[in-house]
Amino acid sequence: MKHLFKLDPAKNLPTNDVTKLIHSGTDGFIIGGTDNVQIEAVQNLYELLVETDLPIFLEISNESMILPEADHFLIPVVLNTENSKWTHGLHKELIKEMGEFIPWKRVTSEGYVILNKDAKVAHLTEAKTDLTDEDIVAYARLAENIFHLPIFYVEYSGMYGDPEVVRKASAALSNTKFWYGGGIRSKEQAAEMAKYADTIIVGNIIYEDLEKALETATIFRKKTV
């Protein structure tokens, strides 16, 4: 997967726009949000996407994101916080409540480093965002070699990040996949981050300028003869 669209169930997205996203050339979708997430909205958005054969990931930020019928679940582990609630606390409570019913083969954990101090998710998780390049590289190595996480996700959350930081963090990984999300608003930015990231995540621009969002995916569309 080179490109994923991230959709917020708390935001309105017309059915026609969803259809365009499905046929854009993207490799799949993440459904996820920070606040005001209602199970009905998650269900409705998921149902709009099920016509596609592309993977649909539910990113579980709270219990409202859990749909038993989903094929893929992403579990965020925020690495750059000192509040254990976001590294394992909430996770343990959910497992305590639902452990025997969790479809573990459909669950993938992702190590998050959140770098936009003004983002809602940074405030919510008490993320320490004033990190050096060396800090971020260290988190990448921690994710891969200590926690053995399959995904390391650098999240600038609405702000376009530093390609050099992305390059350095990506170069530190061998087996863990590197995902980048944040502020991609053009096909040029998509191509720039895709040089280093295994997967780029495109979100906010969907709700600001759909055509520009579609362009970020078309550059990855498989060419046919």
Curated annotation (Swiss-Prot):
- Cofactors, names only: Mg(2+)
Task: Enumerate the GO terms in the molecular function aspect.
Answer: heptaprenylglyceryl phosphate synthase activity; magnesium ion binding; prenyltransferase activity
Q: Which reaction does it catalyse?
A: sn-glycerol 1-phosphate + all-trans-heptaprenyl diphosphate = 3-heptaprenyl-sn-glycero-1-phosphate + diphosphate
| Record pathway | Membrane lipid metabolism; glycerophospholipid metabolism
At which positions is Mg(2+) bound? D8, T34
Pfam families attached to this UniProt entry: PcrB (PF01884)
Residue sites binding sn-glycerol 1-phosphate per the record: K6, Y153, V154, E155, Y156, S157, G158, G183, G203, N204
Gene Ontology biological-process entries: glycerophospholipid biosynthetic process
Give the EC number: 2.5.1.n9
* Family matches, as SUPFAM superfamilies: FMN-linked oxidoreductases (SSF51395)
Q: Which UniProt keywords apply?
A: Lipid biosynthesis, Lipid metabolism, Magnesium, Metal-binding, Phospholipid biosynthesis, Phospholipid metabolism, Transferase
Q: Which top-rank group of organisms is this from?
A: Bacteria
According to its UniProt entry, the function of this protein is described as:
Prenyltransferase that catalyzes in vivo the transfer of the heptaprenyl moiety of heptaprenyl pyrophosphate (HepPP; 35 carbon atoms) to the C3 hydroxyl of sn-glycerol-1-phosphate (G1P), producing heptaprenylglyceryl phosphate (HepGP). This reaction is an ether-bond-formation step in the biosynthesis of archaea-type G1P-based membrane lipids found in Bacillales. To a much lesser extent, is also able to use geranylgeranyl diphosphate (GGPP; C20) as the prenyl donor.
Q: How does it assemble?
A: Homodimer.
Family under the similarity heading: Belongs to the GGGP/HepGP synthase family. Group I subfamily.
The protein, known as = Heptaprenylglyceryl phosphate synthase
Q: Which organism is it from?
A: Listeria monocytogenes serovar 1/2a (strain ATCC BAA-679 / EGD-e)
Q: What is the lineage of its organism?
A: Bacteria, Bacillati, Bacillota, Bacilli, Bacillales
